[in-house]
A protein has these predicted regions:
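N-terminal Rossmann NAD(P)H-binding glycine-rich loop of SDR-like oxidoreductase domains
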Residues: 3-23
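NAD(P)H-binding glycine-rich loop region in Rossmannoid oxidoreductase-like domains
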Residues: 35, 39-89
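Conserved Rossmann-fold NAD(P)-dependent oxidoreductase catalytic core, especially the SDR/UDP-sugar
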Residues: 90-132
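Active-site Tyr-X1-5-Lys
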Residues: 131-156
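Glycine/proline-rich active-site loop of Rossmann-fold NAD(P)-dependent oxidoreductases
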Residues: 140, 152-154, 165-174, 209-219
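Alpha-helical substrate-binding/gating segment
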Residues: 176-184, 192-226
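Mid/C-terminal beta-alpha module of Rossmann-like enzyme folds, strongest
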Residues: 209-259, 292-304
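C-terminal amphipathic/interface module of NAD(P)-dependent oxidoreductases
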Residues: 262-304
């Protein structure tokens, strides 16, 4: 499989690129600067420019581009950057796929914020994504940007990705020193549902969807169990041999998401219904499995 990948230098992009190479697939990275090797191709998503020959050769085009959520300060200017870095990049690639003769499959990153604060309601891919929040509006615009490819008849997959757990990036990297100091615990009340997936399972799920011709539409990339913030904090604390009773400090939330940090307190109980129905199996089905993998521990142990 030849996969053309935007966002290949980020946390998920770097890991997926390495995973695909180990699985025997070829990856061409889209880069904003000059292409320095045969497996790179220059593009300018904001000008709508991408090499049509690269798209024509691809079996799959994938977009993981996006400015990081963990940023401070969250100014109005950064909010625009956050949105454009997702929507404009996705739309440019969707239009390139639509304009191609071969019509490669198109995989686009997305999120679960569109579901909003839904308490203990189990959220499959059929649940409404009408959350009246900043992040909800971002996710809807992000998914809508794939429409040119779908309208042209290409196979389009939107990966509604929950929180990916690994110590090399994302919230685990930020929370680990907090928990090691004994300052970790639930976020907010602890009663809200907090959907997560291990990095390994995300990589496997993305590769599964890229290679499966029957897969199209939106998929929840989240672990199959339902975990509250309190459960997550308790397991995290046990994994690092520290108490986990103190609510996560506000500065951690602000560092994670700036002025939209309050949205991290939403309860979003996501179920990967379509992945499970199509036969995907999780290597890390529980939050304990996922945190053991994220911390590079033996899952049968209780910590280091």
């Amino acid at each position: 499989m030849l996969l053309v990948l935007a966002g290949a230098s980020g946390f998920l992009g770097t890991a997926w690129r390495d995973h695909l190479a180990r699985e025997g697939h070829e990856v061409v990275r889209l880069v904003r600067g000059e292409a320095l090797s045969a497996n790179e191709s220059s593009w300018d998503p904001y000008a709508g420019r991408v090499d049509p020959e690269v798209i024509e050769r691809a079996d799959v085009v994938a977009c993981l581009s996006g400015a990081p959520l963990a940023h401070w300060p969250w100014t109005e200017s950064y909010k625009k950057t956050f949105v454009d870095s997702r929507v404009a990049t996705t739309r440019t690639l969707a239009e390139a796929v639509a304009a191609s003769d071969r019509k490669p499959a198109f995989l686009a990153q997305g999120g679960v914020a569109g579901y909003g604060d839904r308490g203990d309601t189990l959220l499959t891919e059929d649940a409404p994504t009408d959350a009246d929040t900043f992040m909800g509006s971002v996710v809807r615009a992000w998914e809508a940007a794939t429409e040119p490819a779908a309208a042209a008849g290409a196979r389009v997959v939107v990966m509604r990705t929950s929180v990916v757990l690994d110590r090399r990036g994302g919230p685990v990297k930020l929370l680990l020193p907090v928990f090691k100091l004994g300052l970790g615990g639930p976020v907010g009340s602890g009663r809200q549902y907090f959907s997560t997936i291990s990095l390994r399972d995300w990589l496997r799920a993305a590769t599964f969807l890229a290679g499966r011709e029957e897969s199209r539409g939106a998929y929840n990339l989240s672990g199959p169990d339902s975990t509250t913030s309190a459960d997550f904090g308790r397991v995290f604390g046990r994994r690092v041999h520290r108490p986990a009773v103190v609510p996560v400090p506000a500065f951690v939330l602000t560092t994670l998401a700036g002025t939209v940090s309050s949205e991290l307190l939403n309860s979003t109980r996501v179920e990967p219904a379509r992945l499970l129905a199509e036969g995907f199996t999780f290597e890390h089905p529980t939050v304990d499995d996922r945190l053991a993998a994220a911390l590079h521990q033996d899952p049968s142990s209780t910590g280091h």
